[in-house]
Amino acid sequence: MTIVAEVEIPAGFVPQYAMAFGAVDAPAVAVHDGNPLPVRLLKKPAGSVPLAGSLGASGLAGPFLPELDRPIWVTLSGDWSGTVDLLRSVDGGVTKFPLTAGGARWARFTANANEAAAEESEVGASYYLFATLTGGTLTYRVAQ
């Protein structure tokens, strides 16, 4: 929509119909696609509490309660063998499902790792680590 304003006597100016900005003692410039506001979004550090610990035998760790729209990082370290799965729940942990991508298992680890495994968009979802260890001690951290 184009807004046309006419200069009428006795005024020698036309009020802006849109936001404008400018430097001190400089003319104001209208905001438009070619001249956006000089701002950038700042994201504060995540407020979610990391899930961290170690397992010397098979077991379940969790829950991790993520903030929305942030990557969920899984860090696994130590001298361990077995498999570790990142599980997701939307009912407070009553049921937990493995992550999948295109129907194939996702976020299943058999070695030390440090990677973004998921990003959450549903309020109330929680994450768990399920380890099936055949030896050693696993040190884990799930965080944002």
Question: Which residues does each PLM region occupy?
Answer:
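Extended, low-complexity segments enriched in Ser/Thr/Gly and acidic residues that occur primarily
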Residues: M1-G62, P66, P71-T75
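Tryptophan-centered short beta-strand motifs
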Residues: D25-A28, P36, G93-W106
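Surface-exposed or flexible loop/turn and strand-edge residues in extracellular/cell-surface modules
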Residues: A26, G34, D69, S81, ...
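Beta-sandwich interaction modules
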Residues: L60-E67, T100-Q144
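Hydrophobic beta-strand segments within beta-rich accessory/binding domains
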Residues: P66-D79, D85, Y127-T132
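Acidic glycine-/aspartate-rich tracts in secreted/extracellular proteins
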Residues: W80, D91-G93
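Short, surface-exposed coil-to-beta transition loops
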Residues: S81-T83, N114-E115
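Conserved Ser/Thr-centered positions that define the repeating blades of beta-propeller domains
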Residues: L87-S89
